[in-house]
Amino acid sequence: MVTTMDPSRISRIVAVVFVLVIQVVSGNFVFNVTHKFAGKEKQLSELKSHDSFRHARMLANIDLPLGGDSRADSIGLYFTKIKLGSPPKEYYVQVDTGSDILWVNCAPCPKCPVKTDLGIPLSLYDSKTSSTSKNVGCEDDFCSFIMQSETCGAKKPCSYHVVYGDGSTSDGDFIKDNITLEQVTGNLRTAPLAQEVVFGCGKNQSGQLGQTDSAVDGIMGFGQSNTSIISQLAAGGSTKRIFSHCLDNMNGGGIFAVGEVESPVVKTTPIVPNQVHYNVILKGMDVDGDPIDLPPSLASTNGDGGTIIDSGTTLAYLPQNLYNSLIEKITAKQQVKLHMVQETFACFSFTSNTDKAFPVVNLHFEDSLKLSVYPHDYLFSLREDMYCFGWQSGGMTTQDGADVILLGDLVLSNKLVVYDLENEVIGWADHNCSSSIKVKDGSGAAYQLGAENLISAASSVMNGTLVTLLSILIWVFHSFTS
């Protein structure tokens, strides 16, 4: 029997601080990246709302033919501070694997947000104040790649118009200017180094884009399109189009790397070609070896339906029938009385070790790649004696009615996930994300790269919420071969 409980707040939020180190032609660079929900006590409804807004964006009709798009108030889980222009000025942008451009709010913009609940200052980029700013015209190669419209003619600016699922819009022009990265010059020492990139300059935002609860200045996309930051760096010979992440939801810490990973070795599965997102083919699913029947459309190889890997989504979403079968098989192996919290989260009381009591869920992908999701991955503690399932009934379908699975940060944690756009594959391996990985630079030299708690003694209790400051190293490698 299912009963309803009053909404409860999650008692523990982990504040994650990322440090991004990039090695380009002449050295390494550093960014500080912060979790969107850092230091804030969030209701379950806020986590679900984050994903709901993101899903609307992912399934929306988009006027701009890019391999993805951006939404400043809900798109990603992490944001970073970058510098644009000359002299360089600071802007806070969200880091997202589901977006394909870097864009920031630009002056003048009467409807852009002027404040945010994230505790960061918001700024408008102004091309008039940068000595290195250049307009991007319709005749520019960058524009000809993304714009296939007769209205974009000679001597006209390369503009964009994005429409989101909730009716929000973003309009603006593309600009070419310097992004300033902090070059690592020694142990804990950096010096600025600028590199020219093309990014969107948003001047007219409407709808939810003006909301202030979690607004930032823009988006930095790590998607597959040639317009993404990683693709622009690769086109200039600075990096290979390979990146990976390893996020630890148990002990804290983790790694985000751009470049080749030598160890641990990961098995891979093909990325479905010509898709906006990181689509892969799910072939089977089981609970401790007990198979679950999959909807036929999930095995499609043409990109209709299937499974999307998206680290910017918080939870994991399944078609209704598949969700019901999964929860039924899990609770058959460990009987619990489910209660619905905030109408969508299946929760239960439990005082024993969940990893010993609950089964492992295995997802099997093309080319025999397995994703094992352990109880500590798919269950989260609402309070000391209450757990909730991170699996959600998504009801997500394509416009053609094909079922969609969306695997978010919850099931990708505690794994090294590698996105190899050079070979159009994605893969993963179970890994202790608080330890290290071995990465390879363009010369073939291998280096140990690990996550460490730079502020290990910074845990504190704020309004009953335990806030743990963590650090994550992120490395991007020079891809030249000798």
UniProtKB/Swiss-Prot annotation:
Coiled coil: none annotated. One of its GO terms (cellular component) is pollen tube. Disulfide bonds join C347-C388. Highly expressed in pollen and pollen tubes. Mostly expressed in roots, flowers and inflorescence, and at lower levels in stems, seedlings and siliques. Residues 78-429 form the Peptidase A1 domain. A lipid is attached at S456 (GPI-anchor amidated serine). It is an enzyme of class 3 (hydrolase). GO terms for molecular function: aspartic-type endopeptidase activity. Its EC number is 3.4.23.-. GO terms for biological process: pollen development; pollen germination; pollen tube growth; pollen tube guidance; protein catabolic process; proteolysis. Residues 1-27 form the signal peptide. Gene3D superfamilies: Acid Proteases. Residues 457-482 form a propeptide. It is found in: Cell membrane; Cytoplasm, Cytosol. This is Aspartic proteinase 36. It comes from Arabidopsis thaliana (Mouse-ear cress).
